[in-house]
Amino acid sequence: MKFKYGAIVFSGLLGVSAILAACGTRGKFDQIDDGKIKLASSLTSKGAANALQAIVKKYNEVKKPGDYPIEITQIAGGYDQARVDLQSRVGVKDKTNFYNLILNYPDVVSVLARNQMELPFDGVDVSKISPNFLNFNERISGVSKKANYAIPVSVSTDILVLNGPVLHYILNSAKGESKGAQKDNKSAEVQRKSTGQKTVTQPLTIATDSATNGLWKKIEDAAKVNGKKKEEKKSTRSKRATEGTQTTKENTGGDAATSDTKIKESWGAYQEVEGGLKGYQFKAIVFENWHDLIDFSTRVAKSFSKVKDNSNKKGNEIQGVLGVDNSPNALLSSVFAAGNSDYNNFFYKVQNGRADFSNFNNKGSSYKNLKNVFNDYKNLIAQNGLYVNKGGSYSSNFQKFHQLAYSISSTSGFAYSFAGQNSKRFKFTDDGTFVEYPSYTTEVNAPESNNGNDGKQQGQSDQGNLLGTFEVVDKSTSDIKVKPKTQAESKKSSDSKQTANTGKGSNSKQQTPKKTISLYKTKIPQDKTENVDAFLVTDSELISKLEKAKNKKEETKASGKSASARVAVQATQKKQSNEKQIVGYTTTSALSEDGKHIFKLGKLNSENYERKIIVGATVETLEQSTTLQSEEAIVLAAPGKYKDSDQKRVMITQGPNLIGVHANTKENEETKKFVNWFLNKTESWEVKGNGKDSQTTKSLTPAQYFAESASYILPLKETVEKDHKEQTNKNTYVAKALEMLKEVSENKSVSYSDPSDFRSGRFRDALGANFNATINSKANFEKFFQGFKAALGSDFDK
């Protein structure tokens, strides 16, 4: 059956708002004109969020007198929670606190359209945007007329990122040419007997076509880069100790064999097995379609016991062969490609404002294609070779530590995908697991001892109430800069304040004022204010761990080290005897709390993000050869076909759109005025320069500035129609995305995005959740599909 407005219930998660919608409260209403434009944002990327704040500030500075100012309405919880918030406000007919614009996905337009609250952007100049990236507006259900309701201001796509050093070790081992397989047969035999290594009887071969030759050279080059890197011995600093030892030695190997040796330490030895890489011919084409990619991944998994024999992986173990950050994207694009890239062969379609789920309900071609795709994955899942992101733990978190061979990721994730030259991670001392050391992290220090007035005040009078302190930038005085030290003053203090940035010109930089935030366990003192300069910690487990850390005496951990190492540690500790004792770490980065090592702390009024606190961890600085650098990754387009025989290539296009919400005549006019400015007016912006801390000024439209700040792409005609083959973009993800977008603009590839219906978010979520559950359950297709259908509810059957 076809729908224009569909079923009553939007989502089982909507609670009261869904019931209100069901009780006949739907219908258009006007918001009260409060003289301002509200833009709802649920952005989690700091780059994007900060850019949006700068844009709002700029508009309010340059707007004409009488034009309405704009402000941001922040919604926590990401795009899904923002969708729920919008549905709730529509359901209760919120006339006072609703917003005029929202950054979200096009299915939100369909939610608005069920209540005639969508706002067509009539009169907004979108002529700069490539029409191929606006035509999804024709696939939105429930709208009153043909128009642009959602404007793509930040497009990303999915890419396939190959870990060059890991893939080299896998292929070279299967060829029988990994380190230890000497050309001299006698030497090789001695090597095999001493290590237990078996002879490769039917080696893998590399195809000789030009595409495969080119790819194999890139893989070899990546391994050589990994083999040439300086190897920094692991430097571990306890959360209590203030200094460790770190030495650097030059790797004299300088070749791919050295890299293979290092990768083998974590991946283990290659095993020649039937159905694995035994006698297999490797071709570049395996990375161009899903069927061959999954088959190759399954063969790799079978060939390494550390993958196939481990179904309950810890965080510090190999996670699989293939990582998938967005399983709905992988499944939906595969099924779409298998259906000849035609929405008539897809689960559902939207035509003339009406949604049609008949192909799905009648178990048509999309059902059959889903079954084929699922069964491909089932083979890989059976070998424990698939890793999927189940809620914020992205593939890059593991691939950068060589725990995956390759992954499907978003082009917007470049900044998080690779390890730095001195990559660090938190290793939890109780179970050996770890998480990457996140950005925006600072130490939590124990209360000072009873030395001096401050120590007495904090140590005796609080009777153990104070758990620890940390420092943040004091934004109330951010315009007041501390006078920088003179060169002589800096030199005088440099011996006791060595940092990773020593010698990089930091002496000439102005120092930013800091303020101290205190953590209390029973009550916050009268001279402190919660969420301003204090937090009240109520989690008993967190309190226990902080107290345990602060009550332990500082340990040198010099026992077991060499005599020279002990002397070095003791000398350093003597110089730094006044440094504070670390009891944990706090960050505003997006970490998932686990109630064991990572806990929710709260949000400071001066910050835009909630803080987490990490306890029971040591900080490890890793050898570069054990981490993935950007120059060692080979970035390809995500598979564009289901099978190589498919006629068309598919490219996922995704990212938040600027969507209008009806308010009233005046506010609607002012909203469109802002959107026009956002898309078309050139302004001056401060952006990062080529140097680490340098800045420069660029003339960009606000939309361009927003996309550039968030590693997204604004699909302008001038951008997507340009030849990017000779580009020098250091962001290899964006560079690849530009190539792919050009193919879409030239109709060489088909752009895929979900048809937009008020139920499409629930369809996508249910598909992904039930597929991800099979990683552990190993369920067959029938059980998977049964769970998928049950999660959708009855309104999809109508």
Swiss-Prot record:
Residues 193-204, 496-515 have a biased composition (Polar residues). It is a lipid-anchor. A lipid is attached at residue 23 (N-palmitoyl cysteine). InterPro entries: Lipoprotein_10_C, Mycoplasma_lipoprotein_cen_dom, P68-like. It is found in: Cell membrane. Residues 1-22 form the signal peptide. Keywords: Cell membrane, Lipoprotein, Membrane, Palmitate, Signal. It comes from Mycoplasma pneumoniae (strain ATCC 29342 / M129 / Subtype 1) (Mycoplasmoides pneumoniae). Residues 178-192, 226-235, 478-495 have a biased composition (Basic and acidic residues). The keyword Nucleotide-binding does not apply. Transmembrane segments: none annotated. This is Uncharacterized lipoprotein MPN_200. Pfam families: Lipoprotein_10, Lipoprotein_X. Its main location: membrane. GO terms for cellular component: plasma membrane. It comes from the Bacteria.
